[in-house]
Amino acid sequence: LDISRIPFSRFGSYFAVSIERDTNRLIVRDLHGGDEAPSSIFVLELMKHGQAADFDLDVTETRLRIIHRHNHAEYAELCISGEDIIYCRIAGASLKLTAVKTRYDSLMPYGPQQWEYHLYSKEIKLMFTLLQGDARIQAPWKMVGNDSIELVMNPDGDQDEGCVFVIESYKTVWRKKEYEDYARACERVDRHYEQWLRQMPAVPERYEPSRRLAAYITWSCVVHPEGQLNNYAMYMSKNWMFNIWSWDNCFNAMMLSERDPKLALAQLDIFMAHQDESGIYADFINDKFLSFNCCKPPIHAWAFARMRERNAWFDDRAIVARMYDSLARATNYWLGYRRPSASWLPVYNHGNDSGWDNASIFHDGIPVEAPDLAAHLIRQMDILSGMAAELERADEAKAWTEKADELYGLLMDRLYRDGRFVARYAPEDRIIAHQDSLILYMPLIIGYRLPSEVTAALANGLAERFEAQYGLCTESYHSPLYRDNGYWLGPIWAPVTYLFIDALRRNGYNEFASRLAAKFMDLTLAGGMAENFDPFSGKGLVDPAFTWTSSVFLMLARESIQPPEEHHEKIFR
């Protein structure tokens, strides 16, 4: 693993180890508090005879070894053996840990060969316990905190297997325990990862490197329940975006649904547990707080329907009823609080609400009436109608269909002009001139309602104006606003790729869908599991280790071998 791009971590842990981008330092990180909180807590340096030594890194999914460049027998190796504990073994060298501290952060002796570190900025404590060997601590006190904190483990650095220590994370009090030896501790995390890897879907042989990378990223980006997180949460990344967002979670849940349905449902339930009285889901959540500043598009009923296609476990009546009630409230939020009048469609109050933050339809200002939002809501209400009928709530089933019919009529009346879909700038009730965003083609997802010629025009437009070497550009490459690295102004994104592939398949464009799926799988060989990609070179852009990219790859690869059974087609109307 290249930890300058892909953090070293493990399932359930808030610990991560990375190479810092700006300084090239090796950093131990803590992800509590989400991506607005600083994560660096210690700088690691391999030492020899009291001096920093040149080192190389040998990193697998479960071990990180810091190797003296000129003597490979001298090293420090660590594994994150449990969710809240790091084991480290040092041989023939020393390891210096220098705290990246704030004013009140303080280190104090705790017991024999133990030191407790209070991190005020992270609201956690760390216990350092030396199991074998020696340590030298330098932590001069200055009134209200240590002026600096430096721990040198195995300071003499001349003994083979000379030092073993652990770092434990907790909130309040340390619990005494018996420690495993280093090898056994590491074997435990090895087994956990291998079990996860075995659960990942099989892929065509040429994509095995992508499968292993996607498996590692999805495994290592999970954090355990704490604070606002009522269950295990698959974060979007442990690089910079370490929260769970409320549409990213849908793609990770779909991927997990076949092999780990409980964890899959948890990705949705985290947001249901904090659903506002108005019905809105939080934009994102981490252990410390949740944000309602924005929200995300209403794709959740579609995601749940896809999960049911993959695994009948989700057909349990209690699960269906609980999902229905939450999804109904979420849908009514859009209808009740985001609709300026009965003659208008619901609006996005910011590009972030759509998930397409800087798409060209938002360049004139906000709020915006967008055809993708109407289409998502129409499909969501059609699915809710099917769920209501399944739950023997006939009146509600009829009401959802009537609401979907009404919104569909408004969509075609207000946002379909001259053979194409457009967006409107709501304050002036005018059509937005920028019409080269892929988001305007999203009504393909309700192709089952559209006239066949409209569906055909959408599919043809995708191929003619958006299809590039590796897939669909988010802004047409013919547009003057197109940028190779423009976030939603050109680059390929996994979630919308999957939404369009699914829509194309359901509307009979199987060859086109398969072509896009193959292109995306090839893209991961060129650009890894990045947040988004250059459509022509395949270069990975922005965050290089993203979970929804990994999940979309795993789903597409699985579907290339075995298409999902559509035994719940009725719930898509």
Question: What do the predicted segments below correspond to?
Answer:
Residues 203-241, 267-287, 339-369, 409-492, ...:
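Extended glycan-interaction surfaces of carbohydrate-active proteins
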Residues 147-150, 250-251, 428:
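Short alpha-helical segments and helix-capping/turn motifs at coil-helix boundaries
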Residues 1-206, 506, 542, 547, ...:
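Terminal accessory carbohydrate-recognition/targeting modules of carbohydrate-active enzymes
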